[in-house]
A protein has these predicted regions:
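Short C-terminal domain-edge/linker segments immediately following a structured domain
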Residues: 29-36, 136-141, 193-199
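Compositionally biased, low-complexity repeat tracts
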Residues: 50, 78, 134, 144-145
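Active-site/substrate-binding loop(s) of hydrolase catalytic cores
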Residues: 1-121, 126, 174
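Noncatalytic linker/hinge segments flanking ATPase motor cores
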Residues: 42-49, 146-154
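Catalytic cores of secreted/periplasmic or lumenal enzymes
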Residues: 127-143
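Active-site-adjacent mobile loop/cap segments within catalytic or ligand-binding domains
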Residues: 94, 100, 105-108, 113-124, ...
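Feature targets compositionally biased, intrinsically disordered low-complexity regions
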Residues: 4-7, 81, 137, 147-148, ...
Length: 200
């Protein structure tokens, strides 16, 4: 199997060692073999959501981690939770930053859905998180029972209010044509967060 298109160039020239390139190809082969994907390798790479090691950081935090995607045991473009919570340097860095800095609230951005999620299982900061979600205008506000994500960990383990804003209406990756509308919808969010923290 060969990498084609701009992904191959990026992997070869800027990002991936030959071992990492082989890991990406192995993830694709494993997902094809288990019928998790039927798309071409190029499309698989275009839709890639995980880190370079094939761990989906949306599932790598210690919030009901044990029950996440238990049948997916190999690195993948999406959905693989890793070998243990915070197994990835990116997740560790975010957790360390939040724990070491004393955040009062966190807004977590994701791409796809045009909604705000504010809830999770065993949410220690439900009222505060819902108030923060309601303060951000222009989105539908939904509860969720998410697991393994940053918001879920913040609310369950760290005791910090948090929301996830899902930007964009198209499938991931969000089309560049949506960026102006996303910017207009979100340019006041930092001030909204600051006001929320100052008044709560």
């Amino acid at each position: 199997m060969r990498i084609c298109g701009w992904q191959g160039l990026v992997c070869k020239e800027f990002v991936c060692s030959s071992e990492e390139t082989e890991s990406l190809q192995a993830a694709y082969a494993a997902d094809k073999a288990s019928s998790r994907t039927t798309v071409s390798y190029e499309e698989y790479m275009r839709r890639w959501k995980a880190n370079a090691r094939g761990v989906d950081l949306n599932y790598n935090f210690a919030a009901n981690w044990e029950g996440i995607n238990v049948s997916l045991t190999h690195p993948s473009a999406n959905g693989y939770k890793g070998t243990n919570p915070l197994s990835e340097p990116e997740s560790q860095a975010i957790a360390n930053l939040i724990q070491g800095t004393g955040f009062n609230a966190v807004i977590n951005y994701h791409a796809m859905g045009n909604v705000i999620y504010w809830d999770t299982q065993n949410n220690q900061k439900a009222a505060e998180s819902k108030a923060l979600a309601n303060a951000v205008h222009g989105y539908s506000v939904l509860g969720s029972k998410g697991v393994g994500g940053l918001k879920d960990w913040l609310q369950q383990a760290a005791g910090i209010p948090g929301i996830t804003i899902e930007v964009g209406r198209s499938t991931c990756p969000v089309s560049f044509s949506e960026y102006p509308a996303i910017w207009n919808q979100n340019k006041a969010v930092p001030a909204t967060l600051g006001y929320y923290v100052a008044t709560h």
